[in-house]
Amino acid sequence: MQNINEIEELIKLISKLPGLGPKSAKRIVLKLINNRDELVKPLASTLDQVYKNVTRCNFCGSLKSNLSGCINCENSKEKYNKICVVEDIADQWSIENSNIFQGYFHILGGTISSVGQRKEDLLINSLVERVNKENIEEVKLATSATVEGQTTAYYIQDSLKNTSAKVTKLAQGLPVGGEIENLDDGTLFSAFKNRANLNSNSD
């Protein structure tokens, strides 16, 4: 393959996407080149609009448009008494697609970890504020069954101890080390249905 700088750079960028390596990236680039008008132009335009207008909501963690605000917390048409807390937006999408939860979502933006992610970096304070502001009755913790996910869940439980909300956590249906976005609908359903009440374990 000839060294064309623009092509090489595009292949490098695409190969950084999840699940894609250099070979897959090359196939995608060839598909784009062979469909310049149908794919390249609209893709470039859409990516430009996403870059300019789509950001992360600083309150709930969801994606929002700078043109219309956040439909997850600012402009939600529905009123709920439950919030499901997840680590990232991919987890929210997985749960939404499974149709097992009707309520608000709160995206933390990661987990507390020993490699630099601090609790101050996560949207935990705004979660407490939402629980009080929206009169939330139940907070469902849907963090991953990893050490970091469980550490984060227990810290959130402690942060919510002075609220009236019941705090529950996904149950044994969630395999140890399992990440939410990789679970099938059946496993998610079992984990939600058999979730554990953490309030009873509080002092």
What does each model-identified segment do?
Residues 25, 75-143:
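Extended interfacial segments that mediate partner engagement and assembly in macromolecular machines
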Residues 13, 17, 35, 50, ...:
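Conserved, well-folded catalytic cores of nucleic-acid-processing
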Residues 24, 128-203:
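Long C-terminal interaction/binding lobes of large macromolecular proteins
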Residues 18, 37, 50, 63, ...:
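Conserved phosphate/pyrophosphate-binding and hydrolysis machinery centered on Walker-type P-loop NTPases
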Residues 8-12, 26-30, 41, 45, ...:
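Solvent-exposed alpha-helical segments within well-ordered globular domains of core cellular machineries
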Residues 2-7, 16, 26-84, 88-92:
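Cys/His-rich Zn2+-binding cysteine-cluster or related metal-binding knuckle/ribbon modules and their
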Residues 39, 44-47, 58, 71-72, ...:
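Core recognition of P-loop NTPase motor domains used across DNA-transaction enzymes
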